[in-house]
Amino acid sequence: MPRSRINGNFIDKTSSIVANILLRIIPTTSGEKEAFTYYRDGMSAQSEGNYAEALQNYYEATRLEIDPYDRSYILYNIGLIHTSNGEHTKALEYYFRAIERNPFLPQAFNNMAVICHYRGEQAIRQGDSEIAEAWSDQAAEYWKQAIALTPGNYIEAHNWLKIARRFE
């Protein structure tokens, strides 16, 4: 049984019903419908913390989804799961793949910056200032891109850029 049919709360049930109605009335191919179903089930599993199930659904959705814009959100969500699991290298890979398909994902740039900043902080603790500087430079670039896409958002990143004298 698809996950969308087993969700217990009212909002999830309502969202599933609306999504099913939209899938019936909007002209889409069966592959697009199937990809969306896997994506929706992945989001549901992810929101419940069932990351393994979410990844299975997202991987299947990426196999079926042909639209680059839609694929970008699937890849972004895979990146979120890898970030949550502490798999930062994999997360960066998926965020980058998402941005390749949709360069207007400020949240992906922000998450990439957070990971780079974290790695820079780790390098500082390990006494490697050269590596720390490289990671911090990369974090700054990603935060600048996120801020450029959504001015007024990412206030903490904006403040860090000013304090670190990395904002032009």
Curated annotation (Swiss-Prot):
A GO BP entry: photosynthesis
Domain of life (superkingdom): Eukaryota
Record's protein name: Photosystem I assembly protein Ycf3
PANTHER family: CELLULOSE SYNTHASE OPERON PROTEIN C (PTHR44943), TPR REPEAT-CONTAINING PROTEIN MJ0263 (PTHR44943:SF8)
Intervals holding TPR repeats: 35-68, 72-105, 120-153
Species this protein is from: Calycanthus floridus var. glaucus
Organism lineage string: Eukaryota, Viridiplantae, Streptophyta, Embryophyta, Tracheophyta
Family: Belongs to the Ycf3 family.
Record field: transmembrane: none
GO CC terms, sorted: chloroplast thylakoid membrane
Record carries keyword Disulfide bond: no
UniProt function note: Essential for the assembly of the photosystem I (PSI) complex. May act as a chaperone-like factor to guide the assembly of the PSI subunits.
Localisation: Plastid, Chloroplast thylakoid membrane
Membrane topology: Peripheral membrane protein
This protein's UniProt keywords: Chloroplast, Membrane, Photosynthesis, Plastid, Repeat, Thylakoid, TPR repeat
Coiled coil (residue ranges): none
